Amino acid sequence: MRHVTIKADTAFTKGRIDDRIYGSFVEHMGRVVYTGIYEPLHKTADENGFRGDVLQKVRQMGVTAVRYPGGNFVSNYDWRDGIGPVEKRPRKRDLAWKSIETNEVGLDEFMK
């Protein structure tokens, strides 16, 4: 069996890591997007359908950057499917999460 030993000297610093590097990502999994951050009929939804209560909590967490889309969802994602008129966007099988992706929320909506 192989062993690895790591020693960290907390008195030695190379430099400071900018706090803006710490971010998060949004993945189309479960209720993260649909009925999560995006729910047009929710009482706190803005004109783009994003929930104000969820966005407020994200701001309180201090997230400085959000990658969209993220996670395993991107393994089958084509950015062109999430732009243009929503009614003309293709519905596709999401191979990562075994569901149907409606592309109701895409890059156009997220970047607003």
Q: What is each residue range found by the language model?
A:
Residues 1-112:
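Non-catalytic accessory regions flanking glycosidase/transglycosidase catalytic cores in CAZymes
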